[in-house]
């Protein structure tokens, strides 16, 4: 199965080699037929501490690195594709 790639905004860079990325998704409510926005925060591994709060980051699934981190940030510029 291919690894998922998500895009979101960095909301925290306080941890060493860790960023928290908020990913927002939209869907149509089945009863109200209205577009609903939902967001989820993912802890992602940032080896070089390159991302800062407010920047848009792309994250990819990986093997678990810690209790909360199962995602890695892709390098800036989009050079690396999985």
Swiss-Prot record:
The gene is rpsQ. InterPro entries: NA-bd_OB-fold, Ribosomal_uS17, Ribosomal_uS17_bact/chlr. It holds the Pfam family Ribosomal_S17. PANTHER family: 40S RIBOSOMAL PROTEIN S11 FAMILY MEMBER, SMALL RIBOSOMAL SUBUNIT PROTEIN US17M. This is Small ribosomal subunit protein uS17. Keywords: Ribonucleoprotein, Ribosomal protein, RNA-binding, rRNA-binding. HAMAP family: Ribosomal_uS17_B. It comes from the Bacteria. One of its GO terms (biological process) is translation. Part of the 30S ribosomal subunit. Gene3D superfamilies: Nucleic acid-binding proteins (2.40.50.140). GO terms for molecular function: rRNA binding; structural constituent of ribosome.
């Amino acid at each position: 199965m291919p690894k998922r790639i998500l895009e979101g905004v960095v909301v925290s860079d306080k941890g060493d080699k860790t960023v928290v990325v908020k990913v927002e998704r939209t869907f149509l409510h089945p009863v109200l037929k209205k577009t609903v926005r939902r967001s989820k925060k993912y802890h992602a591994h940032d080896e070089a501490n390159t991302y800062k709060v407010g920047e848009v980051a792309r994250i990819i699934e990986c093997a678990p690195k810690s209790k909360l981190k199962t995602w890695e940030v892709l390098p800036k510029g989009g050079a690396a594709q999985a």
